[in-house]
Amino acid sequence: MRFGWLEVAALTAASVANAQVFDNSHGNNQELAFSPPFYPSPWADGQGEWADAHRRAVEIVSQMTLAEKVNLTTGTGWEMDRCVGQTGSVPRLGINWGLCGQDSPLGIRFSDLNSAFPAGTNVAATWDKTLAYLRGKAMGEEFNDKGVDILLGPAAGPLGKYPDGGRIWEGFSPDPALTGVLFAETIKGIQDAGVIATAKHYILNEQEHFRQVGEAQGYGYNITETISSNVDDKTMHELYLWPFADAVRAGVGAVMCSYNQINNSYGCQNSQTLNKLLKAELGFQGFVMSDWSAHHSGVGAALAGLDMSMPGDISFDDGLSFWGTNLTVSVLNGTVPAWRVDDMAVRIMTAYYKVGRDRLRIPPNFSSWTRDEYGWEHSAVSEGAWTKVNDFVNVQRSHSQIIREIGAASTVLLKNTGALPLTGKEVKVGVLGEDAGSNPWGANGCPDRGCDNGTLAMAWGSGTANFPYLVTPEQAIQREVISNGGNVFAVTDNGALSQMADVASQSSVSLVFVNADSGEGFISVDGNEGDRKNLTLWKNGEAVIDTVVSHCNNTIVVIHSVGPVLIDRWYDNPNVTAIIWAGLPGQESGNSLVDVLYGRVNPSAKTPFTWGKTRESYGAPLLTEPNNGNGAPQDDFNEGVFIDYRHFDKRNETPIYEFGHGLSYTTFGYSHLRVQALNSSSSAYVPTSGETKPAPTYGEIGSAADYLYPEGLKRITKFIYPWLNSTDLEDSSDDPNYGWEDSEYIPEGARDGSPQPLLKAGGAPGGNPTLYQDLVRVSATITNTGNVAGYEVPQLYVSLGGPNEPRVVLRKFDRIFLAPGEQKVWTTTLNRRDLANWDVEAQDWVITKYPKKVHVGSSSRKLPLRAPLPRVY
């Protein structure tokens, strides 16, 4: 397998040999940001709830040969098995087919008879932990029923630094606390269904431009390395790492490392982010898998903490791999210590046992590569058996109910001057805009939803699923109006402005539908290369609104979008009587919307991002042109922790609609704030100390002769195997750089299996256990002061007090139901992490001595209750 994998590793080692101070300037004469090295890669120890699964993993891995361990770590290649990623198998020990990994965070990609769930951003708009869990559970059930072992989701990267970032909709919200809670609940739901969840994309994967070299070159950008996201230590901990800590604390089984570089070290071979932050500090017990083709070196990635290579080949279907045979070679010749591969296998099998795959597992009953019933066993090369590859198993169960419920619960009522809810007595209803109707090519007519035709219920890319059906707004509204004896007139061509004007002038209410789309960078739609070119509405949307508003004084605007759009030119027009953001609601789109429009569901959703007046209101623009010659484009996160509402607050800029805003058909009041310290001597912060045990090894390595290709094996072209062609390791590797001295490419300490010091901020999954001790109890009385029953989302923000801190940061929230006139006392607690800052010198969390305050209300800028926090440490 000819590839200079040692050479790549050497370059990686050299790039991290000397940690340097973060530098924001670039150019041929300027130093770039560097990522400090951290070695060796921590070995899993089965802490806490992982103990039993870890014990079982050790038992089975101890029986494995080196080749069998390697088989678990390496995918067999793109389109070589049924799933988008599938490892080798270990049939001798009962793992009769490889572990199947499959997209996506909102449903099963490349499949059929599955559900299409609301996107992550819609879940964030519900602010509902239970709904997040139930969605995760339902998705997990569907993946399990299709024979999938590893669900490639949910996502908290991108977090949302850029409002126009292409994949922000796959995640939840630019707020780390809101994202972290819903991220964790989704993971719990998926794994309670018996499927391994994957927290992705780790980390700082905030834009699509320049994420992959080949992709960027295809768009005409002359770069040779992927983008580097350059961030300081404080921002990393307090913003971007925060939700991943919640994921690890929730027991996530897998973490997917990202395409981008972090401080000029690739995400899947970055020892600082994988070894130190994820495994040593956060105590992650599961396995790290690469994003597809994000694996850039063999030895370098192995020593830096990567545990699984996906899809196994270097480029799709090239038959080459950094691992597979090469990983077997590297262990046999001592380049990679045996304990490192043992740890990879143990981590994979620990996650496998943790979620119960040994009890629930069935073979994949679908093919990602064809909808035909029969096909080649190995699709990429048309080899193996011609066999049944699709069993057409319907896995939808009754999940349409939770999809519809989340769709309605995530529908944000941004403005309402009394137009909503509709009474059902409207005689003439206009439904205007392409976004109300069907895609003329069919709901799944564009591969990976890579177009913007008809209503937008899902964005584009690998984070998608096939719709089993799609209820459009036009269909649902028409059914509702007709059942009420009314008339409905629809114009769904955005170029038919004169026809829209005619309908609007005759309608008692005009419902206008507009959208804005985005997605993954491998698809460009209308010149949007994944990321959006701007924040304007798509397909003449502004002109559609202008036309209708000028002819109808009761215009309701419904926005389906991946994130914020610019609404400043029309939102305050008196003829715009209501504005709804419906996000990406999935297959029940129209039904969910009608439930809210007609008052069957009282809206309770809150916007999970800020609506600014201009794109400039959000701060730093996307990096859309290379700024480092043909080297890695440098994306400096100079705004630090100040993104979204934190940025608006810092600039004292008033948004159109603030983070957390959302109206209801009733009203709520807040009163009687109470704050009580809970700290005692037993709750004092205790930095973790001590050291690990030595790196364990399991089983014997054997010799090269033990790992020759088995006699009689019919080798599949380009399939990634763990075996050797020859007992001559150099010949088996077929690497032109084989034989380099270790000192040329092995970082210092990378193979040290002796006991290692524990980090002060570590000690358990999620970080130091005392970070999660409750220090303060806060309560407030919430009253439904209106005439309609409904849910309210109380939000608690903290002012951390420091001179360079955000004005407020969200820390707690809930969603509570109140009948008209009913009062409830909402009680929550603040733990040490909620009140702490990351100290870059101490490398630990500290509660500063600056005075702190707590604020409670209905949004980030409607906080009627506030009080000083007692001093706790």
UniProtKB/Swiss-Prot annotation:
Keywords on record: Carbohydrate metabolism, Cellulose degradation, Glycoprotein, Glycosidase, Hydrolase, Polysaccharide degradation, Secreted, Signal
EC number: 3.2.1.21
Disordered, as annotated region: 731-764
Subcellular location: Secreted
Pfam entry (one): Glyco_hydro_3_C
GO molecular function, one term: beta-glucosidase activity
Glycosylation sites: N71, N222, N263, N326, N333, N365, N453, N534, N553, N575, N679, N725
Coiled-coil portions: none
GO biological process, one term: cellulose catabolic process
Signal peptide per UniProt: 1-19
Keyword check for Secreted: yes
UniProt catalytic activity: Hydrolysis of terminal, non-reducing beta-D-glucosyl residues with release of beta-D-glucose
Annotated family: Belongs to the glycosyl hydrolase 3 family.
Protein name per its UniProtKB record: Probable beta-glucosidase A
Organism encoding this protein: Aspergillus fumigatus (strain CBS 144.89 / FGSC A1163 / CEA10)
